Amino acid sequence: MDVIDLTKALVAKRSITPDDAGCQPMLATMLSEAGFEVSHHRFGEVDNLLATHGGASPQTGPHILWIGHTDVVPPGPEDQWSSPPFEPTERGGELVGRGVADMKGSDAAMVVALIDFVERHPDHAGRVSLLITSDEEGPAIDGIRAVVPHLKATGLWPDVCLVGEPSSHAALGDRIRIGRRGSIQAVLRIEGKQGHTAYSLPEDNPAHRAGPLIAALGALEFDDGDEAFDPTRLQISNLQAGTGADNVSPGELVMYFNIRNNPNTPADALKRQIEDLIEAHDPGPWALNWRVSAEPFGPCSGEYLDGVVQAFEATLGQAPKLDTGGGTSDGRFFGPEGVPVIEAGPVNATIHQIDERVALADLKKLPEVFHAMMASILGVR
């Protein structure tokens, strides 16, 4: 099956997170028939597929682990799509469908490249593996995170991770990610006293008391960033207060915010800074809950990155820009432990949008690029 047909077959499966919807069994069959050792790892409602070929050691060569995901975000209002989101449609030189860019096109390209690689080089140096989950777009608890202990216990911990996430900006290969900022979620609850607006006092209203604090949080500066990372930033994502009635003052205000932090501001220091700020503004009785969903990692450097850059130059005729922008990926489960993580994939301009799409020419080129990345790292011609 070529990469276009395989992408279409994957997109046609309604795999809204965490439902794999049969994507992984199809890929597992292809990889098994090509000589890969395949294992399935299900945790809760999440499916994870691991396929591996060869052996890695300091004598034989490194272990390359490709990472992907078969789950997609919901399509949104399906009547706003120009064609049904789970009926992959070619139009104007592009393939349209939910998940075609994030990241079923890359899933297909990784599988095609891996099968082609081991067919051409059955006795290749090192080990090449693929780990795919159906829990990347969701909580990411029963996905890659849950498989990590198995990798460590069975000697399958990688030397380098290649992630097929859509990293390109305007053209295929113009950008790859060599690290990521962390992601921290917080929920702040400020107590007040619910009452009739005609009788409530300003000091009873948590929305009034929170005003200066909201402004201070929005203006908070943590660091200046550096040549590899943007500054750490906080964004308030939700504010909830009141009953919906215009004559009832709220008894509680709930504020949700997200922080993207670089390595210069670790989570513990960031938490202390924010908690000190809340104390200083004294908004009344409050409680704050934290959840760290990703630690920052990178930027990576060295021979593996050099090999990937050389592969891009050879196949696409240009050296990619190296950056650490964007959101989080499943590289978060390897990068903070010292594994170089390199993310390379198609253009990300339409991911999570209505009429998500990718250029057919880019899809056809991806397996060649991915093959060249492996060949360059393993020293195979």
Each model region followed by its residue ranges:
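Metal-dependent amide/peptide-bond hydrolase catalytic core
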Residues: 166-171, 178-179, 184-381
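Active-site metal-coordination/substrate-binding segment of hydrolases
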Residues: 61-129, 154
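N-terminal helical capping/dimerization or prosegment-like subdomains
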Residues: 1-76, 252-256, 270-271, 360-362
